[in-house]
Curated annotation (Swiss-Prot):
Keywords: ATP-binding, Glycoprotein, Membrane, Nucleotide-binding, Repeat, Signal, Transmembrane, Transmembrane helix, Transport. It is found in: Membrane. Coiled coil: none annotated. Interacts with 1-naphthylphthalamic acid (NPA). ATP 1 binds at residues 436-443. SUPFAM superfamilies: ABC transporter transmembrane region, P-loop containing nucleoside triphosphate hydrolases. Glycans are attached at residues 466, 651, 806, 1217, 1256. This is ABC transporter B family member 2. Gene3D superfamilies: ABC transporter type 1, transmembrane domain, P-loop containing nucleotide triphosphate hydrolases. Belongs to the ABC transporter superfamily. ABCB family. Multidrug resistance exporter (TC 3.A.1.201) subfamily. InterPro entries: AAA+_ATPase, ABC1_TM_dom, ABC1_TM_sf, ABC_transporter-like_ATP-bd, ABC_transporter-like_CS, P-loop_NTPase, Type_1_exporter. The keyword Metal-binding does not apply. The keyword Signal applies.
């Protein structure tokens, strides 16, 4: 029908009228028909299935991806687009010259000398065209690379800015650190890829498509119209592929985020994981999360194969139609052979360009899906954004705070009411203490004052103004906060204190450090205030971190001070002086103090007793104790009784429970094992990493388990690639036949058309099989690499995790990016490489058979083509590593800021974080322009050589014909085949940047996989019938991250089997280092650590740790249920054993009071539980393990008085006949220990039982006891 219509139009209407008619018929009718057909297939009235919603909803428009382009970016994009369009249009222009040369070469039989002269002239025109291509391709690559980097940097900043301004409730229920790392590491990289080179490539191919058709219409419009009728079919195939791909990509991303969250959490709690030998369990959970990506990845491979196969199938069918229709055009004398042939070539190349644009369209589809959660977060409205626009700022702050009928439940648990119409008045300038049991709601008061949450009803007033109407940043600027678990950032001590006041002077910083009693330990550090504290302050002891946090609050000089167990992590000596400093700071300020230990709040102006979300008593210390039946008096008696039971000779209260953490500081809980490490900085001259050399053989050895998929995919890729030179051969054969008689032409064209139809079916089959095989192999590779990397990471010693490049955020980022890019290089790019390899091999075989002389000349030009791309590759290699490192540091900062979101919000540090983040992005942004310029120039040079070689080939072909060494037929066929080869080589070499990135990622992967942990069992000997004798003999020890700071020198310690040993002393004296050495988190530099008389270096590491139970000062829980967290102690335990452990740890009662009981999710790092609840779950976990050796690091520190008494009794029962090492600041908790060792400066300065040590009135133990006695009521 279409063919008849074309001839009818060509005979009765001029082109200007007939072309619009045909275009209308081509694009209206089929499209409408298809639309109706699709509508008919959709059942009316039925709600869309959930699966379809997932496919269609998570995407943004293509234009929205460019939301961050400014005027300079618009200029760059305009110039880059102009360059891409000129570059793309150059191929159709080349075929105009080529068509003229065909006619000239055809005249060579009649006028050989004139023909040679004219061929030389047109060959020179090819050189001029090559120069234009050089500059346009340079402009294309340089501009798009630079603007892509710029826009991605702005998107990263906007995403982090929005994330930091979110309501805190979002982080309790939806957002996680893993999700942020995934978005910044992976999703924005996907968007950046689409915004930079992919847009340039797309415009390049689309301009080639448009130019090809435009030139075709001006030459022989009938041929172009026939081809145009195929376009809707190609577009439909591409559209269906894109539609299905979006849903699959979104699902794969969701699975990757879940896996990333598991990895980030496990690495962050690596000490707990290794202590409980939970490495294999963590790997199993990680693998299970990745298995969904494997399932959806296989479907994505099938979809891609069918999509690309369908498009190429349609293209082959269109070539069959074109070859036949062109012969009819020539036969009817509508156009000559040369003109018809070049028109056909232009249209074919235009059609091919659509196929070549398919990967770019695929990149846009991925970018639209990846950008959806990014833009959703950026555009999400929050209280912070609203208050910045409409919130008021008070001219003066007196500090009067009032809770008026405040009702509140946490968004993550709306069915648990915390406050029901709470009324509380906090007078201006007064100190108000909140006391009560764990979980009573004390810390929630602080959360509401800080406006981390909004009350459901009622109001919180500041000086009579509802704080919900105030500017939230201004409000938080008036408040100073010290949390129970101090959140520090991975920078220097000075920078951490500056979070309190960004423009503080050196004198103000020093004064704050003096007031908080931090100046002494800071001055003892080799780098003083410039000491790096490590990720979340991991290089400092708990007491040191707390003092820096107090310094940060002091330097802020706030009108309102909120203290949540501010001195809980300090030793007795420091606590007294810090408490005195805080007493001075609190004068004249409205202060809210949350405390369990009543001795710290007896001087408060007002004490409010909180019980189950109600204020049950209110008054000062004297008034409250005057009521013997009151709640406060009961709490006081309970503490005194607990103290007297432990130590009747000293009438004091030494309990140190922390407050409830219902306000949930989302900081990474870390053990205090590193308490004596002063800095994470590497010693001078240390080599941070060794470059890993990766051979191609080793690279592909990673896919050896899937060799069957690889072989099958490779064969199909070869077949798919080899079809292109065969197509070129068929087309050139058609050209030659156009100059024969009509009968001969019909015979040849029929054969060629049938071959093309067969090729279309083969193409569909091989593309589908190829992408199914490579898709499956890619997902299996990604799963295997991620699993092996994760396992290898967890095998490393704890000292490795202390290094600045191995923080949890950075390692999670590497797992995310390295494996994905490895899949890209080994699988995605391999399909193109293998196809092009099949193409090149087939092309050269055919070309050498047809005309070896011409083939050799063309082959001689290839080194010039390749050299341009090699230069580009070498240049990119020089900068790739630095950029990857810069992004890793930026990702670490982003992850850290989100995990410490409450501290960031409380100190209004959002802008400071963004400034630091922008600083980390500065280097890649600066170098992007330079990289783009040089990469573009080298790319342009290689393109120049490719097109110049065409001119050389045609000139040499005419010379061979002139000398009678070749005929017209062989020259045309050879030239057509070699054109296809050159295009394929250009495409292959254009992959150099991607191959380079992949090579760097592979090196990064093998760097982790090949690293041998420095702590391994020298033999596989296991301990049986462990009684528990521990001995440290002649131990010398320094932390690997700071070898110049000696912790122990010739240290000796013996813990007898079944006995308890308590380690006491000031913060930083070496107590927690003993636990680290027993667990073999570190090895001594000299001396031995022995259990049962055996050097633990010679024992199997996991077997050793199975006999050791651990309860840390800061409990580390996992984002699963309470039941699963307790079960972590013994995976094979029964339900009754889990419940019994919880009962012994005094956790059963609060667990059963929760709506979901043991199935309650604890949240990321236990964020949904209070501090006391987290600690009891951790104790239950240790009880369930039933170890021979028990290590307690302030195990009851987070409990209220009543819970502590019961839990201490449970621990006493657990410690019976079990070797126990207890680390404690509060001496009341270790009175019953068989032996007490007093540590000072890494030495045991006194040792004995409590009864013996208190007799020595001048001894260090008695001094510590006396100091604590003075601090009690």
């Amino acid at each position: 029908m279409y063919i008849s219509l074309i001839f009818f139009l060509s005979n009765h209407f001029p082109p200007l009228i007939s072309i619009p008619i045909f275009i209308f018929l081509s694009f209206s009718s089929p499209t409408n028909y298809t639309h109706l057909k699709l509508k008919k297939m959709q059942p009316s009235g039925d709600p869309a299935p959930e699966k379809e919603k997932e496919m269609t909803q998570p995407k943004v428009s293509l234009l929205k991806l460019f939301s961050f382009a400014d005027f300079y970016d618009c200029v760059l994009m305009t110039l880059g687009s102009v360059g891409a369009c000129i570059h793309g249009a150059s191929v159709p222009i080349f075929f105009i010259f080529f068509g003229k040369l065909i006619n000239i070469i055809g005249l060579a039989y009649l006028f050989p000398k004139q023909a040679s002269h004219r061929v030389a002239k047109y060959s020179l025109d090819f050189v001029y065209l090559s120069v234009a291509i050089l500059f346009s391709s340079w402009l294309e690559v340089a501009c798009w690379m630079h603007t892509g980097e710029r826009q991605a940097a702005k998107m990263r900043r906007a995403y982090l800015r929005s994330m930091l301004s979110q309501d805190i409730s979002l982080f309790d229920t939806e957002a996680s650190t893993g999700e942020v790392i995934s978005a910044i590491t992976s999703d924005i990289l996907v968007v950046q890829d689409a915004l930079s080179e992919k847009v340039g490539n797309f415009l390049h191919y689309i301009s080639r498509f448009i130019a090809g058709f435009a030139i075709g219409f001006t030459s022989v419009w009938q041929i172009s119209l026939v081809t145009l009728s195929i376009v809707p079919l190609i577009a439909l195939a591409g559209g269906i592929y894109a539609f299905v791909a979006i849903g699959l990509i979104a699902r794969v991303r969701k699975s990757y985020i879940k896996a990333g969250e598991i990895a980030e959490e496990v690495i962050g709690n690596v000490r707990t994981v290794q202590a409980f030998t939970g490495e294999e369990r963590a790997v199993r959970l990680y693998r299970e999360a990745l298995e969904n990506t494997y399932k959806y990845g296989r479907k994505a491979g099938l979809t891609k194969g069918l999509g690309l196969g369908s498009m190429h199938c349609v293209l082959f069918l269109s070539w069959a139609l074109l070859v036949w229709f062109t012969s009819v055009v020539v036969h009817k004398d509508i156009a000559d052979g040369g003109k018809s042939f070049t028109t056909m070539l232009n249209v074919v190349i235009a059609g091919l360009s659509l196929g070549q644009a398919a990967p770019d369209i695929s990149a846009f589809v991925r970018a639209k899906a990846a950008a959806y959660p990014i833009f959703k977060m950026i555009e999400r409205n929050t209280v912070t954004k609203t208050s910045a626009k409409s919130g008021r700022k008070l001219g003066k702050v007196d500090g009067h705070i009032q809770f008026k009928d405040a009702t509140f439940s946490y968004p993550s648990r709306p069915d648990v009411v915390i406050f029901d119409r709470l009324n509380l008045a906090i007078p201006a300038g007064k100190i108000v203490a909140l006391v009560g049991g764990s979980g009573s709601g004390k810390s929630t008061v602080i959360s509401l004052i800080e406006r981390f949450y909004e009350p459901i009803s009622g109001a919180v007033l500041l000086d009579g103004n509802n704080i919900s109407e105030l500017d939230i940043k201004w409000l938080r600027g008036q408040i100073g906060l010290v949390n129970q678990e101090p959140a520090l950032f991975a920078t220097t001590i000075r920078e951490n204190i500056l979070y309190g006041k960004d423009d503080a002077t050196a004198e103000e910083i020093t004064r704050a450090a003096k007031l908080s009693e931090a100046i002494s330990f800071i001055n003892n550090l080799p780098e003083g205030f410039e000491t790096q504290v490590g990720e979340r302050g991991i290089q400092l002891s708990g007491g040191q971190k707390q003092r820096i946090a107090i310094s940060r609050a002091i330097v802020k000089n706030p009108s309102i001070l909120l203290l949540d167990e501010a001195t809980s992590a300090l030793d007795a000596e420091s606590e007294k002086s810090v408490q005195e400093a805080l007493d001075r700071v609190m004068v004249g300020r409205t202060t809210v103090v949350v405390a369990h230990r009543l001795s710290t709040v007896r001087n408060a102006d007002i004490i409010a007793v909180v019980h189950e979300g109600k204020i049950v008593e209110f008054g000062n210390h004297e008034n409250l104790i005057s009521n013997p039946d009151g709640a406060y008096s009961s709490l006081l008696r309970l503490q005194e009784t607990a103290s007297l039971q432990r130590n009747p000779s000293l009438n004091r209260t030494l309990s140190r429970p922390h407050s409830i953490k219902y306000s949930r500081e989302l900081s990474r809980t870390r053990s205090s094992f590193c308490s004596e490490r002063e800095s994470v900085t590497r010693p001078d001259g240390a080599d941070p990493s060794k470059k890993v050399k990766v051979t191609v053989g080793r690279l592909y050895s990673m896919i050896r388990p899937d060799w069957m998929y690889g072989v099958c995919g490779t064969i199909c890729a070869f077949i798919a690639g080899s079809q292109m030179p065969l197509f070129a051969l068929g087309v050139s054969q058609a050209l030659v036949s156009y100059y024969s008689g009509w009968d001969e032409t019909q015979k040849e064209i029929k054969k060629i058309a049938i071959l093309f139809c067969c090729a279309s079916v083969i193409t569909l089959i091989v593309y589908t099989i190829e992408h199914i095989c490579f898709g499956t192999m890619g997902e299996r590779l990604t799963l295997r690499v991620r699993e092996n990397m994760f396992r290898a990471i967890l095998k490393n010693e704890i000292g490795w995790f202390d290094e600045v490049d191995n923080t949890s955020s950075m390692l999670a980022s590497r797992l995310e990016s390295d494996a994905t890019l490895l899949k890209t290089i080994v699988v995605d790019r391999s399909t193109i490489l293998l196809q092009n390899l099949g193409l090149v091999v087939t092309s050269f075989i055919i070309a050498f058979i047809l005309n070896w002389r011409l083939t050799l000349v063309v082959l001689a030009t290839y080194p010039l083509v390749i050299s341009g791309h090699i230069s580009e590759k070498l240049f990119m290699q020089g900068y790739g590593g630095d950029l990857n490192k810069a992004y890793l540091k930026a990702n670490m900062l982003a992850g850290e800021s989100v995990s410490n979101i409450r501290t960031v919000a409380a100190f209004c540090a959002e802008e400071k974080i963004l400034e630091l983040y922008s600083r980390e992005l500065l280097e890649p942004s600066k170098s992007s322009f330079r990289r783009g310029q040089i990469a573009g120039l080298f790319y342009g040079v290689s393109q120049f050589f490719i097109f110049s070689s065409y001119g050389l080939a045609l000139w040499y072909g005419s010379t061979l014909m002139d000398k009678g060494l070749a005929g017209f037929k062989s020259v045309m066929k050879t030239f057509m085949v070699l054109i296809v080869t050159a295009l394929a080589m250009g495409e292959t070499l254009a992959l150099a940047p991607d191959l380079l990135k992949g090579n760097q990622m592979v090196a990064s992967v093998f760097e982790i996989l090949d690293r041998k942990t420095q702590i391994v069992g020298e033999t596989s000997e296991e301990l049986n019938n462990v009684e528990g004798t521990i001995e440290l003999k002649g131990v010398h020890f320094s932390y690997p991250s700071r070898p110049d700071v000696v912790i122990f020198r010739d240290f000796d310690l013996i813990v007898r089997a079944g006995k308890s040993m308590a380690l006491v002393g000031q913060s930083g004296s070496g107590k927690s280092s003993v636990i680290s050495l027993i667990l073999r988190f570190y090895d001594p530099t000299a001396g031995k650590v022995m259990i049962e008389g055996k050097d633990i270096k010679k024992l199997d590491l996991k077997a050793l740790r199975k006999h050791i139970g651990l309860v840390q000062q800061e409990p580390a829980l996992f984002a699963t249920t309470i039941y699963e967290n307790i079960l972590y102690g013994n995976e094979g335990a029964s339900q009754s054993e889990v419940v019994e452990s919880a009962m012994l740890a005094n956790a059963h009662s609060f667990i059963t009071s929760l709506p979901e009981g043991y199935s309650t999710k604890v949240g990321e790092r236990g964020v949904q539980m209070s501090g006391g609840q987290r600690q009891r779950i951790a104790i239950a976990r240790a009880i369930l393990k039933n170890p021979a050796i028990l290590l307690l690091d302030e195990a009851t520190s987070a409990l209220d008085v009543e819970s502590e008494r019961v839990v201490q009794q449970a621990l006493d029962r657990l410690m019976a006949n079990r070797t126990t090492v207890v680390v404690a600041h509060r001496l009341s908790t270790i009175k019953n220990a068989d032996t007490i060792s007093v540590l000072h400066g890494g030495k045991i300065v006194e040792q004995g039982s409590h009864r013996k040590l208190v007799l020595n009135k001048s001894g260090p133990y008695f001094k510590l006891i006396s100091l604590q006695q003075q601090q009690q009521p």
